């Protein structure tokens, strides 16, 4: 509706409010206001006439447009000028427009105002592609959605263009969102919860954990099928929604903004995943890994890290996997180096060492100095690292070889994993083990690699197998093959 003082003495019905006094103005809007469109549509009007006396104000586009440095006085706008989607623009005029848009709009400048530019007549310019690339790279400019472009040919061999916001959505929503960006401390409070880790991956863990603990997934349409764009708008999700409710776009945009805040390259990708979807690729080392935080929303009893720091094949990128689970509209995959395997890292949790292997799983690789003196080893629940839970799907090769402190082993093949594996020589030489419990009640197979249970025990150990008769028989056979000689079963 416009702007008003706190006691609503007067309302300014305009979206162009200039600072004149110390009076604080508050955005006024209708309750349950609906948005008719969120699409980043670009409409072109070629019946427009350019003012011949105003030609000098139109920036001539080419790839050499100089970029301004970001000021980033407000945390919300702390991002880099050129994002990864810029690489998907293959024409000089398009790259020039991208840079000109950054110069005009960065740090929250010129909210809801149009930009003037010109191109040499005959030069190609993919307006929709440029606008989409720019808005995907800069979700902090949340008020930028659809736009209209007025075009007119000049007598000097140039085509003059005026690109302005589209009003298919409610203009007061733009005012409201920008006002909350400048005055809300909710984003800053979320950032304070994110600790910068020792490594890039540790920082990403903390970002993902904070986002998924505070954002909640919701549907973006009502029972009548009417869509509301607010759940796709980062400014609304963070600064206005009490429960931080959003759809996939909200997760992807917030993740990118926080990554950029900590200096981590991240791209959000819009496309298809059996329906419209949005996800991220984030750079760790020299490669980009797939992240889909929608799977980890705070409504889940346990955060699912299946789609976190994954390889391109898992994400169904065309050329790696025929299923095409996620297909990008802009095919940014052609321009950045995607990882073909999940991101793996070695971590220590408590008394044991693990390798996170992808798909929400990890391998128990060994013990710390204190862990080597543990007498009872139980593997059932997951491992929590940086607030994210990973299922143990394997005991690594030689993980406990020649450990004479171990007396009891209890392994449960949890429901989440397909197969549990005990690696080569994992317990070889653990001659003092007296009790082994293998819980296979979910019907998951437990595989034993060569010499994994070659204990070298002089006394018989007792093996308790919790499973179906068929699996129990199979497990006993595999244990013998794995080197276990002296044992009795329940």
Could you say what each language-model-derived stretch is?
Residues 173-240:
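Secondary-structure boundary elements
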Residues 291, 351, 357-360, 371-394, ...:
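Structural signature of tandem-repeat unit edges
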Residues 249-315:
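Hydrophobic/aromatic-rich core segments of domains that either
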Residues 37-164:
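Intrinsically disordered, low-complexity N-terminal segments that are enriched in acidic
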Residues 1-15, 397:
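Surface-exposed interfaces of beta-sheet-rich extracellular modules
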Residues 12-34, 162-168, 430, 452-453:
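Conserved "repeat-terminator" motif of extracellular CCP/Sushi domains
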């Amino acid at each position: 509706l416009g702007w008003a003082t706190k006691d609503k003495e007067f309302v300014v019905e305009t979206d162009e409010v200039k600072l004149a006094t110390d009076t604080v103005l508050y955005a006024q809007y209708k309750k349950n206001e609906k948005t008719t469109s969120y699409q980043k549509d670009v409409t072109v009007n070629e019946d427009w006439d350019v003012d011949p006396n105003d030609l000098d104000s139109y920036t001539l586009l080419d790839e050499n447009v100089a970029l301004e440095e970001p000021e980033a006085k407000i945390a919300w706008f702390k991002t880099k000028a050129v994002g990864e989607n810029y690489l998907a623009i293959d024409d000089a005029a398009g790259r020039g427009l991208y840079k000109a848009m950054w110069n005009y709009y960065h740090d929250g400048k010129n909210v809801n105002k149009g930009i003037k530019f010109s191109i040499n007549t005959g030069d190609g310019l993919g307006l929709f592609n440029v606008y989409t690339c720019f808005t995907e790279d800069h979700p902090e400019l949340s008020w930028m959605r659809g736009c209209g472009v007025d075009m007119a040919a000049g007598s000097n061999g140039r085509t003059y263009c005026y690109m302005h916001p589209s009003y298919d959505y409610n203009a007061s929503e733009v005012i409201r969102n920008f006002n909350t960006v400048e005055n809300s401390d909710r984003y800053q409070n979320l950032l304070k919860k994110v600790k910068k880790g020792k490594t890039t991956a540790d920082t990403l863990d903390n970002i993902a954990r904070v986002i998924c603990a505070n954002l909640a997934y919701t549907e973006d349409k009502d029972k009548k099928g009417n869509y509301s764009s607010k759940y796709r708008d980062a400014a609304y999700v963070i600064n206005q929604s009490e429960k931080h409710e959003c759809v996939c776009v909200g997760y992807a945009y917030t993740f990118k903004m926080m990554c950029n805040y900590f200096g981590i390259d991240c791209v959000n990708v819009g496309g298809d995943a059996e329906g419209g979807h949005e996800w991220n690729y984030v750079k760790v080392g020299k490669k980009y890994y797939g992240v889909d935080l929608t799977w980890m929303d705070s409504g889940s009893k346990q955060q699912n890290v299946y789609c976190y720091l994954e390889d391109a094949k898992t994400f169904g990128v065309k050329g790696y996997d025929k299923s095409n689970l996620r297909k990008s509209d802009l095919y940014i995959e052609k321009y950045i180096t995607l990882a073909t395997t999940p991101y793996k890292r070695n971590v220590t949790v408590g008394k044991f060492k693990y390798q996170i292997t992808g798909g929400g799983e990890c391998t128990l690789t060994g013990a710390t100095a204190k862990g080597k003196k543990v007498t009872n080893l139980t593997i059932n629940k997951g491992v929590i690292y940086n607030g994210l839970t990973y299922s143990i799907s394997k005991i690594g090769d030689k993980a406990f070889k020649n450990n004479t402190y171990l007396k009891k082993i209890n392994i449960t093949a949890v429901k989440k994993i397909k197969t549990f594996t005990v690696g080569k020589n994992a317990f070889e030489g653990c001659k003092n083990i007296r009790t082994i419990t293998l819980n296979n009640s979910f019907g998951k197979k437990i595989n034993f690699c060569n010499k994994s249970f070659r204990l070298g025990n002089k006394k018989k150990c007792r093996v308790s197998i919790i499973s179906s008769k068929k699996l129990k028989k199979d497990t006993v056979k595999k244990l013998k093959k794995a080197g276990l000689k002296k044992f009795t079963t329940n």
